[in-house]
Amino acid sequence: MKNIFIVLIFLFLSSCAEVKAQDKQHEEQQIIEQEPLQNNETPQEANQESINSANTAKSVLHNHDNNQTESVLTQDLHEQKKTAITTKVTFKIDNNDMVLGNKKSNVIVVEYFSPTCPHCAYYHQTIFPALKKKYIDTNKIAYVVREFIATKQDLDAAILARCKGDINSFIQFHNIILQQQDKWAYSNKYRELLTDIGQLGGISPEEYKQCLNSDKITETLIANTNLVAKAPKFIGTPSFFVNGVQTENYSIDNISRAVDRALEDETKSK
């Protein structure tokens, strides 16, 4: 009888231990589930914050990639690019635009570039000179250069180029920034290097600092970025819009074909 009683006590204690273990496991699970909901966040707020963070990361990655090499594009992206070239977006020249050529021309070419974009640097060094000679120097078109800001480096470099505010200074720094891209864009000391570039072009460190703190310049750059970011199927930088229609890529043949077509249409309409 005594042995039976001992066995019953043993079974009772085992059962209690198991219940306590289950309760502890349940509490730990609740804690784990509640960990993301810190700082008095609701589940909906926490979920939205995660979504926003993911979207921001995807946006920066997409914008800074800038790789338009055909071999890495999937079939879906090929289809998106085909759709993009038929999409028309309204672009009007405003007082903040940097314009080359004939401002009064009805054929407006808008280039979107990022100061840290390698393809943009390549375009300006190898393709742009021929287009400039054919269309800009002859005053056939209005050529608008707009920045697409994807990184802090892009912003600081674009501010330097716009610091003095005139077109000649802008082009001077625009060219130097792209030519020297590999020396400053990927350095931890990019701000110092941009400051040095500014001094060589006649902008003192104090002037550059004032421009960096200028809300007007920053707002212009962000507005330029937001405008094209809303364009359907925007394919990254460099991108070109001829009278609002995006070209397929930045080859001289594609851009020239689009410009010639626009000039022809303009002649017929007169």
Curated annotation (Swiss-Prot):
Q: What is the enzyme's main class?
A: oxidoreductase
- Output the CDD domains linked to this UniProt entry: DsbA_family
Enzyme Commission number(s): 1.8.-.-
List the keywords (alphabetical).
Disulfide bond, Oxidoreductase, Periplasm, Redox-active center, Signal
Q: Which GO terms describe its molecular function?
A: disulfide oxidoreductase activity
Entry keyword annotation includes Disulfide bond: yes
Pfam families membership: Thioredoxin_4 (PF13462)
> Locate the Thioredoxin domain: which residues?
71-264
Isomerase as a keyword of this entry, yes or no, is: no
Q: What is its main location?
A: periplasm
Which residues belong to the signal peptide in this entry?
1-17
Disulphide-bridged cysteine pairs? C117-C120
Enumerate the InterPro entries for this protein.
Thioredoxin-like_fold, Thioredoxin-like_sf, Thioredoxin_CS, Thioredoxin_domain
GO annotation, cellular component aspect: periplasmic space
Protein's cellular compartments: Periplasm
Q: What function is annotated for this protein?
A: May be required for disulfide bond formation in some proteins.
Family statement: Belongs to the thioredoxin family. DsbA subfamily.
Q: What is this protein called?
A: Putative protein-disulfide oxidoreductase RT0103
> Which organism does this sequence originate in?
Rickettsia typhi (strain ATCC VR-144 / Wilmington)
